[in-house]
């Protein structure tokens, strides 16, 4: 089966995809020569492309699912004027969207779906820095496309709600369906703290769920737990800023609204608030990584544990 070594180009039209060695411990006769199971493709077409770019494709699709369900829940609530949704349904939309997005993408990319997650794992878990811009680009694009799809789906309702106007602020504002905007009474410092705090909790749970020495989790338990964490954050901490907690989730849809007629106000509104969801979640994630690794994590991947080495010894 294919593994992380990726495609190996051979002479001629065929390509060999990955290989898993049989060392005699399983799947073969003990002591037999090492062999490899390979997938040989007779051309280097689409299969080659989707294998080579499986990680960004997975991040794109996972983030698309997260934002589509979350923004869709906001659209349904706002455009129906609360008749078919409320804050709880929005919180559930994002929580379920995150759980499903991780479930879809986790096997292929790890299911980051958030630049704060990617950067935190690069600093504290040795995630390759060369992949960081690729992951973040895929996440932003996934969020952008999700916003476009939800906009097209709800376009009749948007016209019914606001007519031809595309307002960022006001009674008929619809920009907040797609990107986050703070409550008018919030200061920049207060909004920054709120976004960082929410992301702290999210990343803390993610680090716990991916800690091999913590309670064992499965591909089902981890996404559900992380999704429920986002729902809990939304219910308890989300009111003041709209709980972006994710630069891609906010910037992708914000960029989309800029292009479709909401104008530069999507960036200038509320004292240029747009930079808060870009920076604060990353800060919150880094603090979460520092606290978790300082108090709980025993693994060797963290630079905080650079003097720790684990040895496997036979027990008499």
UniProtKB/Swiss-Prot annotation:
Keywords for the protein's UniProt record, in alphabetical order: Cell membrane, Glycoprotein, Membrane, Repeat, Transmembrane, Transmembrane helix, Transport
Region (Disordered): 1-31
GO molecular function: glycerol channel activity; water channel activity
Extent of motif NPA 1: 114-116
Spans within the Extracellular topological domain: 81-86, 153-187, 241-271
Expression induction or repression: Expression is increased significantly in arbuscule-enriched cortical cells and extraradical mycelia of maize roots under drought stress.
Compartments where located: Cell membrane; Membrane
Cytoplasmic topological intervals: 1-59, 108-131, 209-219, 293-316
Compositional bias annotation for Polar residues: 11-24
Family as reported in the entry's similarity comment: Belongs to the MIP/aquaporin (TC 1.A.8) family.
Native source organism of the sequence: Rhizophagus irregularis (Arbuscular mycorrhizal fungus)
Keyword Transmembrane: yes
Record flagged with keyword Disulfide bond: no
Catalytic reactions of this protein: H2O(in) = H2O(out); glycerol(in) = glycerol(out)
Name of protein: Aquaglyceroporin-2
Membrane topology, from the record: Multi-pass membrane protein
Major subcellular site: membrane
